[in-house]
């Protein structure tokens, strides 16, 4: 008998679980109300905002994980976050005005600043690349004699 005072209570199910999200829907709703962004906040607004934030976080973390793997590291550091965000066109536009602490800069050298190759050096390099492309002939027992 589930009366007023005694009995078994149902286990509370959070809105995050109902929506299938990891980000806290209740906390985001509280922040929306407390921040006075509007007089009233709809019930779907914090769910939608939590989903958007979770998607963005997952996207950035995936790209940062790839950047860490490219650098043969197992831990994501701010440098990997910066490389992930700045090398992605859409995220780079979204976070254009954001500074990531200890992120460094994107490696870039203007082509005007690079040393110019002399025609002789360029020709010599082209010949060496052609020679490297050819595979050397193996000496067999018949050719050694």
From Swiss-Prot:
**Gene Ontology BP terms:** heterochromatin formation
Q: In which tissues is it expressed?
A: Abundant in meristematic tissues.
Q: Which GO terms describe its cellular component?
A: nucleosome; nucleus
Location in or out of the cell: Nucleus; Chromosome
| Motif SPKK motif per record, residues | 135-138
Query: What family does this chain come from, according to its entry?
Result: Belongs to the histone H2A family.
What role is this protein assigned? Core component of nucleosome. Nucleosomes wrap and compact DNA into chromatin, limiting DNA accessibility to the cellular machineries which require DNA as a template. Histones thereby play a central role in transcription regulation, DNA repair, DNA replication and chromosomal stability. DNA accessibility is regulated via a complex set of post-translational modifications of histones, also called histone code, and nucleosome remodeling.
* Record-given protein name: Protein H2A.5
């Amino acid at each position: 008998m589930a009366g007023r005072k005694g009995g078994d209570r149902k286990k509370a199910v959070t809105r995050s679980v109902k929506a299938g999200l990891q980000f806290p829907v209740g906390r985001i709703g509280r922040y929306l109300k407390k921040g006075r962004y509007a007089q009233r906040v709809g019930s779907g607004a914090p769910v939608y905002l939590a989903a958007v934030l979770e998607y963005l976080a997952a996207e950035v973390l995936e790209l940062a994980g790839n950047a860490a793997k490219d650098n043969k590291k197992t831990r994501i550091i701010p440098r990997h976050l910066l490389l992930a965000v700045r090398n992605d066109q859409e995220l780079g536009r979204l976070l254009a005005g954001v500074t990531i602490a200890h992120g460094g800069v994107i490696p870039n050298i203007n082509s005007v600043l690079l040393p110019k190759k002399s025609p002789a050096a360029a020709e010599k390099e082209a010949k060496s690349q052609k020679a490297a492309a050819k595979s050397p002939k193996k000496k067999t027992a018949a050719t050694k004699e």
